[in-house]
Amino acid sequence: MRRLLLSALCALPVMAALPVLALAEEIKPAIVFDMGGKFDKSFNESVHNGAQAFTKETSIEVREFEPQNDTQREQALRNLARRGQTPIVAVGFNQASALKTVSAEFPKLHFVILDTVVEAPNVQSIVFREEQGSYLAGMLAALRSGTGKVGFVGGMDVPLIRKFACGYGQGARAANPKAEVFQNMTGSTPTAWNDPVRGAELTRSQIERGADVIFQAAGATGLGVLQAAADAGKYGIGVDSNQNHLHPGHVLTSMVKRLDVAVQKAFQEAREGRFTPGTRVLGLEDDGISLAFDDNNAKIVTAEMRAKVDQARQDIVAGKIKVHDYMTDNSCPN
């Protein structure tokens, strides 16, 4: 009898662990990337890095799909759902319509969408306060500029990208009320995210007008912006991931969105049975948004510049500085 009792007690820790192990085995995460692919050195790649970190930590593989055209998004989401993948991450606002359709078809599965909101009982939407980080980027650009003229190159002309541009302009004028801010959008279709040649052309045009710092929020198109700025001896500003290393000494900073952390956290919560539908908003206050400072830009960002930007960050978090969000009313001050 005593031997049986000891055997039962020894088995308890193993039995207690079984639900967790089963849950870890049940999760089958997947990602459908946006146009530009998972190695765009920007938005998609940050998501991919988060998935890689999750796999490294848990040994759970993440199935990935890179669409080559607009029509493949819904098909990819549906195919992954039919395979029982869950949670499925849809990368980018362009997937909102497709995700709304597919999530309704598979109500027992979990979905995550980045950069827009889809209201459904099985969807978690993760959005960012891009206007806050763009404001800081604009401040730094104006502080660094020798001409008082700075530029912005966006990808697809949509409210989200105008949100970046609006925050950038507000920050630039906060640092220098006389600053001129040039703005160009690459196009009106998703191909605008993957046209570095056009990005370079728009950058050179702004440089010819006197801009010496250009911020890009344009996916793979932005790589052309950074290249053109570096070639001309000017400064670019990276976006989404830390792009400072692409042209050391010529990328003033990068406005980083911690998409990697957001995705890794979403997968981990699902694995632990804590998936929560609804909207999650990340900004400066929780380090969901930040500027990148490292050895690659240390020599071009002075201590005085850094101090002013750091103070502005604190003031935004404290509510002393209110950065207007373009998407609240589709307008921008100034």
Residue ranges and their predicted role:
Residues 7-19:
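Bacterial N-terminal signal peptides
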